[in-house]
């Protein structure tokens, strides 16, 4: 079923010839009204020009009207030309939409170190037809993903729709992929930005596929107010639900992955320590390999936990895998064959109780397979 965008938003895409595969690779997301926006971007020191430009636009505090995305070329590490090409992409999109370049955010994803084919973007932008539906945009922004990622929610009549891409080079650091959430709710910009920071910390920053943070990651929330005001608490609960669903989709679609890993940590001294502990477990290559092999190797979970920086007493901590208690201060008697069978599920849950306080947090990851190595041995980054 087609997902309709919130009131006032339109999107579209085309095949501009940026991807060697010939798949759709150039997309626009447009608001008919000036939108308040909140933005989180990669902290990678080799960030792409699109990130530097996005930060400058964000600091200006001015409304946003559109996003232009190219998938297939990161436009990163190409010297001063990359900055000029990024500005040119914004100018071309603004010309296509009748806007000023300062109202247009750019995003790029794909191969690093290759000059951006601006001439293909110039030719492709006029070919993009805009509709009130999400699917064309969601498809065009993909790179090594195996499926589009779209989620939606409704809060007191206002709609929230999220679109994301991400499969590899995914690791927590202020975004972790490309994600675009749009809503027709009317939300003051200051409240939008504060709430978005909390949502990103709890969702997108809790995804890890391979421990590598991309140079181009961003997570954006646009609110154009076309519907009107809604209760802020309920609104951000809806935003977090959409972001969490997208985060799970990204982890489930990790390069070469066969299963989703959900790590829940409770009883931490603080929420931040719980999130940190969950991320450490979800990101452990040893545990991810054991997960692929259906090996209930709780020692790898405990070792990752010990390296997380979260406070706990190993003699009190409790580890449960797929509902099966494995460890509580010492190994517990359990049926390894039964536990291994339980790990064959498409979604595997690790529950850890640190017994230090009330802090709780989740992280999302996947198993580590031979296919991950194969994909990244063949894909030029």
Swiss-Prot record:
Substrate binds at residues 143, 165, 176, 255, 376, 381. The record marks 109-110 as: Involved in the stabilization of negative charge on the oxyanion by the formation of the oxyanion hole. Its EC number is 2.3.1.35, 2.3.1.1. It catalyses: N(2)-acetyl-L-ornithine + L-glutamate = N-acetyl-L-glutamate + L-ornithine; L-glutamate + acetyl-CoA = N-acetyl-L-glutamate + CoA + H(+). It is found in: Cytoplasm. Keywords: Acyltransferase, Amino-acid biosynthesis, Arginine biosynthesis, Autocatalytic cleavage, Cytoplasm, Multifunctional enzyme, Transferase. InterPro entries: Arg_biosynth_ArgJ, ArgJ-like_dom_sf, ArgJ_beta_C. GO terms for biological process: L-arginine biosynthetic process; ornithine biosynthetic process. GO terms for molecular function: glutamate N-acetyltransferase activity; L-glutamate N-acetyltransferase activity. Belongs to the ArgJ family. This is Arginine biosynthesis bifunctional protein ArgJ. It comes from Thermus thermophilus (strain ATCC BAA-163 / DSM 7039 / HB27). The gene is argJ.
């Amino acid at each position: 079923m087609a997902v309709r965008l919130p009131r006032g938003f339109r999107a579209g895409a085309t095949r501009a010839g940026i991807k060697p595969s010939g798949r759709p690779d150039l997309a626009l997301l447009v608001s008919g009204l000036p939108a308040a926006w909140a933005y989180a971007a990669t902290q990678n020191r080799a960030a792409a020009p699109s990130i530097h430009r996005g930060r400058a636009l964000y600091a200006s505090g001015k409304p946003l009207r559109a996003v232009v995305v190219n998938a297939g070329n990161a436009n990163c590490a190409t010297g001063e030309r990359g900055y000029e090409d990024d500005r040119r992409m914004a100018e071309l999109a603004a010309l296509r939409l009748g806007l000023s370049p300062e109202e247009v955010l750019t995003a790029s994803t794909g191969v690093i170190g290759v000059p951006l084919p601006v001439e293909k973007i110039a030719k492709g932008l006029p070919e993009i037809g805009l509709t009130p539906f999400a699917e064309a945009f969601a498809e065009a922004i993909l790179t090594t993903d195996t499926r589009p990622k779209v989620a939606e929610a409704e809060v007191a009549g206002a709609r929230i729709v999220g679109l994301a891409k991400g499969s590899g080079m995914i690791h927590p650091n202020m975004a972790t992929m490309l994600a675009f959430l749009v809503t027709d709710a009317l939300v003051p910009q200051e409240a939008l930005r504060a709430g978005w920071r909390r949502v990103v910390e709890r969702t997108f920053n809790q995804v890890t596929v391979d421990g590598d943070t991309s140079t181009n990651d961003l997570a954006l929330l646009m609110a154009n107010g076309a519907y009107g005001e809604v209760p802020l608490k309920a609104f951000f609960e809806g935003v977090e639900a959409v972001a969490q669903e997208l985060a799970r989709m990204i982890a489930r679609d990790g390069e070469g992955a066969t299963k989703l890993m959900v790590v829940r940590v409770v009883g931490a001294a603080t929420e931040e320590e719980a999130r940190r502990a969950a991320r450490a477990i979800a990101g452990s290559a040893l545990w991810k390999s054991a997960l692929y092999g259906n090996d209930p190797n709780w020692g790898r979970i405990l070792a990752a936990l010990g390296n997380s920086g979260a406070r706990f007493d190993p003699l009190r901590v409790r580890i449960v895998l797929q509902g099966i208690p494995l460890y509580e201060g010492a190994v517990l008697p359990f049926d390894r064959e039964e536990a291994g069978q339980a790990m064959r599920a498409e979604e595997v849950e690790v529950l850890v109780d640190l017994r230090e306080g009330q802090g709780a947090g989740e992280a999302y990851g996947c198993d580590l397979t031979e296919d991950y190595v194969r994909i990244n041995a063949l894909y030029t980054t």
